[in-house]
Each structure stands twice: as C-alpha cells, then as structure tokens.
C-alpha cells in the first residue's frame, strides 16, 4: 500500500496517550496529509486550496516521549518475540487452548496482542467469560472482546441508516473462543511466561470447582432477572 498508519493510543507498543502517525513515500499523499493535520497548510506552510484541514499537529512533548520509546523499541520487540515463542511452545503441549499461528510469509511481527483460542470442550463446557474471570483471578491479564458494531457510536449510526448487522460466525468467536493478552505482558522474564502458563494449567486442573461456580452464577443471574421482572 501507499500509506501506513500507526496508533499511539495508551495500549499500543509505543504510546503518547493518544494520536498516531501516518507514513508514505507518495509525495502527493504526503502534501495532502500534512494539509489535513496543519489547518490546510502543506509542507511549505502554504494554504492548500482544496483542503481546509484541522489542527491535528502533535505537540513537542508528545513527540519527545515517542522519540525516547523509539530508541528502546527494537530491543523490546526482540524480547517480546522471544517470550511469545516460549509461550507458544508451552501452549503446544496443552489441549483446549490454541493461538493464532503466524503466517510463514510474515518476516517480523509487532507482537501487539497475543490471541488465544479457547475450546470449552476441553474445559467441561465452562463459558469463555467464566474461564477469563478465573484467569484474571490468577493474575493473568486476559480480556474478552466485542464486535465493533456493538459499540454505542456505531450502533447509533446503524440505527440511523436502518442497518441490522448480522455476523453470526464473528459473534460466536468473540463470545465463545477469543481471548487476548496485551503485548506488555511479554516484556517480562522467562518466569513470568511460565507463571501465565501455570495459571492456565491450574484453572484447567480445577475445572470441577469452576463448573460449580459457573452453575451458581447462572442460577443467580436467572433469579435476578425474575426479581427485576
């Protein structure tokens, strides 16, 4: 492609809290993009008659924070890649938990989110949400996801346009299969990676107790629904 986009939102590998960067080797796109973020003024600071633009210029403070991180990024990425490889090798020995395998054509990964694939058949049909809650109780930073069309800003737009999205396979994945671990977890040491794996193993080995908790939670939820009615 002609344009690359990188976010610097607080959860990213490099962060300044918010903002991002756009990269391009296309001179025409470069001139228009600068005008878009600089109140319509291009690289030569002259007004672009086609583009009004906004004030999206990055502050010097944010740039300084990012420059410091840029120097550390190569060594941090190397550490993450090494720890992710270790974690994958441990998961390969466990039934019921898989991960997104990297395409062999990819020569280098940013390691932003590590995605787990949960198979409840190996965990006595415990729901994904209960499994995730158990892992968090063991100190593992996992989270479930949601579909973007369920977010308030998208829901309002879809309602206005009378669009009813229907993505059943995606719904199943986010509700029953997919868990993510943030990238900064893999900046730890070898012991940290083994601790994460051991936490998953502990939850699996105590599945009967977790099953009882899951049933109790469902009963409680039904009772609360009856009371609210």
Where are these regions (language model features)?
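Ser/Thr/Pro-rich, low-complexity mucin-like regions
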Residues: 190-207
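Acidic/polar loop patches that form or flank catalytic/metal-binding clefts of enzymes
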Residues: 30-31, 99-100, 125-126, 140-145
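Conserved PLP cofactor-binding pocket of PLP-dependent enzymes
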Residues: 41-46, 86-91, 130-179, 208-222
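Extended hydrophobic/aromatic segments used for targeting, binding, or gating
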Residues: 107, 112, 121, 128-130, ...
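Active-site region of PLP-dependent enzymes
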Residues: 1-113
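Terminal low-complexity tails and localization/encapsulation signals of metabolic enzymes
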Residues: 198, 220-224, 229
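Short amphipathic alpha-helices in soluble, non-transmembrane regions
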Residues: 33, 126-138, 196-200
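Conserved PLP-binding active-site segment of the aspartate aminotransferase-like
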Residues: 103-105, 112-123, 143-148, 152-162, ...
């Amino acid at each position: 492609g002609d344009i690359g986009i990188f976010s610097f939102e607080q959860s990213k590998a490099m962060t300044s809290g918010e903002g991002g960067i756009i990269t391009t080797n296309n001179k025409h796109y470069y001139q228009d993009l600068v005008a878009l973020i600089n109140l319509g003024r291009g690289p030569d600071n002259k007004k672009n008659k086609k583009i009004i633009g906004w004030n999206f210029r990055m502050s010097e403070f944010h740039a300084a924070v990012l420059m410091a991180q840029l120097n550390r990024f190569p060594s941090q990425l190397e550490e993450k890649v090494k720890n992710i490889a270790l974690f994958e090798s441990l998961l390969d020995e466990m039934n019921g938990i898989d991960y997104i395998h990297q395409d062999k054509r990819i020569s280098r990964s940013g390691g932003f989110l590590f995605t787990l694939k949960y198979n409840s058949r190996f965990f006595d049909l415990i729901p994904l949400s209960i499994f995730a809650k158990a892992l968090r109780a063991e100190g593992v930073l996992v989270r479930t996801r949601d579909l973007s069309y369920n977010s308030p800003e998208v829901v309002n737009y879809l309602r206005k346009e009378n669009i009813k999205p229907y993505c059943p396979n995606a719904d199943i994945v986010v509700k029953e299969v997919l868990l993510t671990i943030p990238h900064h977890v893999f900046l730890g040491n070898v012991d940290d990676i083994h601790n994460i794996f051991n936490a998953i193993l502990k939850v699996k080995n105590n599945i009967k107790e977790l099953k009882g908790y899951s049933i109790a939670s469902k009963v409680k939820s039904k009772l609360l629904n009856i009371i609210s009615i």
